């Protein structure tokens, strides 16, 4: 019997080149999905919120029995972001962190990688990512 993965990556961090448009963020999602071998069923969809004190962009993509989302607050520097990816496909935190870094210049991040296959969540790995200077 096939038992799919239930992997969930949660990341909080800071970037110095935040996405400034919905088009840029949607393209980033398309490239990420391709890198980790998932199938898009809806989206990506992104929207910029221009609410004082909460300025930033939010994007989501619905994947086959999975999802990815990111929220970037760009009024501060470096910009803070929160990201999560839930997938039944195999992927690694490094794949995602490198993709964030390539596009948005990741400065620092903390992350947790969780196995949600059983009723009890299991922490697979966690760590910190710091830019090399």
Language model segments and positions:
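Polybasic/polar functional segments that serve as interface/processing modules
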Residues: 1-133
């Amino acid at each position: 019997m096939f038992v799919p993965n239930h992997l969930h990556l949660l990341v909080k961090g800071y970037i110095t080149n935040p996405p400034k448009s919905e088009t840029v963020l949607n393209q980033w999602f398309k490239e990420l999905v391709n890198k980790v071998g998932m199938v898009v069923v809806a989206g990506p969809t992104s929207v910029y919120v221009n609410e004082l004190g909460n300025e930033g962009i939010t994007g989501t993509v619905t994947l086959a029995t999975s999802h990815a989302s990111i929220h970037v607050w760009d009024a501060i520097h470096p910009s803070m972001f929160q990201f999560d990816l839930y997938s039944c496909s195999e992927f690694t935190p490094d794949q995602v962190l490198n993709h964030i870094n390539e596009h948005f210049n990741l400065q620092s991040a903390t992350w947790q990688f969780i196995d949600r296959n059983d009723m009890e969540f299991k922490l697979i790995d966690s760590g910190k990512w710091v830019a090399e200077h």
